[in-house]
């Protein structure tokens, strides 16, 4: 739901478009690098997160890390294919589907070399948090805490 309580949804690029800042272009690969991502205005329904889609299938960790190096206030959400992030009214992200969600939290980044390096160079990021959530696990966008939820129960 958005701030007015209206349910919103998007798939693929439509999911990325929901937030205030969206990744309009980005190089694939695991290493963040200066200038490898172009952000564009999104629909602006939230400024709390940046969404990237087809995340693991297209090796997009580096571009999400780069986007957060530019905008460390936001939480990065990488959606695997066949997977959705349901955000409850209490700002808790729930995973639905057969894949996972990668949550990247830049709130505690204590150093980023983004301002000191030339375009195309790798970015140094210290203090970045990364969570891999599957169905049953959650992440609260307000407290920025991940929880294993139902996954803690032993397999029967």
Indicate where each model-derived feature is located.
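Catalytic nucleophile loop
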Residues: 1-22
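C-terminal and late-domain segments of enzyme folds
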Residues: 22-156
């Amino acid at each position: 739901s958005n701030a007015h309580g209206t349910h919103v949804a998007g798939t693929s690029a439509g999911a990325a478009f929901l937030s205030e800042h969206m990744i309009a272009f980005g190089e694939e690969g695991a290493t963040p690098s200066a200038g490898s991502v172009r952000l564009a205005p999104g629909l602006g329904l939230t400024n709390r997160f940046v969404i990237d889609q087809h995340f693991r299938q297209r090796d997009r960790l580096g571009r999400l890390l780069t986007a957060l190096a530019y905008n460390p206030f936001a939480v990065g959400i990488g959606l695997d294919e066949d997977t959705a992030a349901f955000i409850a009214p209490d700002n808790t992200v729930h995973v639905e589907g057969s894949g996972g969600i990668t949550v990247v939290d830049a709130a505690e980044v204590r150093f980023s070399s983004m301002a000191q390096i030339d375009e195309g160079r790798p970015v140094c990021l210290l203090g970045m948090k990364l969570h891999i959530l599957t169905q049953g696990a959650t992440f609260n966008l307000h407290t920025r805490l991940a929880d294993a939820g139902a996954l803690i129960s032993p397999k029967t």
